[in-house]
Amino acid sequence: MAVPKKKTSKSKRNMRRSHLALGKINVIVDSHTGEYKLPHHISLVDGTYNNRQVVTKKIDTEEVA
C-alpha cells in the first residue's frame, strides 16, 4: 500500500487546491424587463433572447376565467 514519505504541509496542500475554487457568476440586467439574468440565456420573465421573442407563455384557462 502506498503511503506518503513525508507529511504534506498545509501550505502545499492549499496551493495544490488553489485552482479548485469556484468563480463568480456573471449576471447582467435584462434591457427589456430590468430583471437579472445570465448572459446568452433566455429571459425567464418574458421569454426573449437577443431582443427577439423566442418562447411564448402558456395561458392557463383557469387563471383567465
Curated annotation (Swiss-Prot):
This is Large ribosomal subunit protein bL32. Belongs to the bacterial ribosomal protein bL32 family. The keyword Ribonucleoprotein applies. GO terms for cellular component: large ribosomal subunit. The keyword Transmembrane does not apply. Keywords: Ribonucleoprotein, Ribosomal protein. It comes from the Bacteria. Gene3D superfamilies: Single helix bin. It holds the Pfam family Ribosomal_L32p. GO terms for molecular function: structural constituent of ribosome. One of its GO terms (biological process) is translation.
